[in-house]
Amino acid sequence: HNLIMCNKANLLNQSAFLLGVPGSGKSFSAKELIAFLILNTADDVLVCDPENEFGALAAALGKETATVIHMAAGGKDRLNAMYMVDGYGENNPIVEKSQFIMSLVEQIDKAGVGPQQKSIIDRCTALVYQDAERTGKPATLCDLRNKLLEQPEEKAKEIALSLELFTTGSLDIFGHESTVDLDKRIVVFDIHGLGEQLKPTGLLVITDTILNRVTLNWKKGKRTHIFIDEFHVVFENEQSGIFF
C-alpha cells in the first residue's frame, strides 16, 4: 500500500493510461492532474473531451487561462483544417499537409482516393499554400475546393464536390478560418456535439490541430500535455488511431 511516485519527465516514455471501472474516478484524477500542471508548471494542456466532462474545469480556471472549443455542426466555433504552423511535420510541410488532406478526403469519400486523385490533391494543396504565402491570408478548405474547380481534370471536380458539404454546406466548421482562441494554456476540444457523420473528420482535424500546437510549443521549448478522455473513441477512427 506504499505510494509510488515518479517524475514522468525523467521516463523514456512519458505516456500514461488511467484505467478503472466506471465510476472509479478516472476523469476526476485527470482533472486533478490538469489543475496541478496549470498551477505548478508553465506547461500547456490540450484535452479531447468526447463527453463534455472538462468544460467546468476550464471555466473554473478562468478565461485568461483556458478555452473550450465546442465542435458541432452549425456551431459558431470553427477550426481551419488547413492551418499550418512553421515547422509543421518532420520533413517538407507542404508534402505532410498534402498527405493529411488526402486522409481527410478519404474520410469524406468512402470510395477512396486513387493515384490520380492524390496527384490532383497534391498539386492543388501546393498551389493553395503558394497563394496563401503570397497574399498573407491563411489557406482554407474553401480555397482548396476553389482551386480544384479550376483544374481541367474531371476527377478534380469530383473531389471538389466531395468537399462541398464541408466547405459551403451544413458541415462547414472545418472549411473556413478558425474563430477560436488556440493560444490559451488549456484548450479543451469538446466533441460531444459532433454527429456520427462529422466525428471521423472532426477527430482528424483535431489531431492535426494538436500537432500544430505541439510543434509550436516544441520550438519554444515548452512542454505540452495531451489528455484524451474515453480514449477508445479515437480508435473508432482509423486515421486518428494511427496518429496516437
Language-model-detected regions and their locations in the chain:
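Glycine-rich phosphate-binding loop of nucleotide-binding enzymes
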Residues: H1-M71, F244
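P-loop NTPase motor domains
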Residues: L3, N52-A66, A73-F244
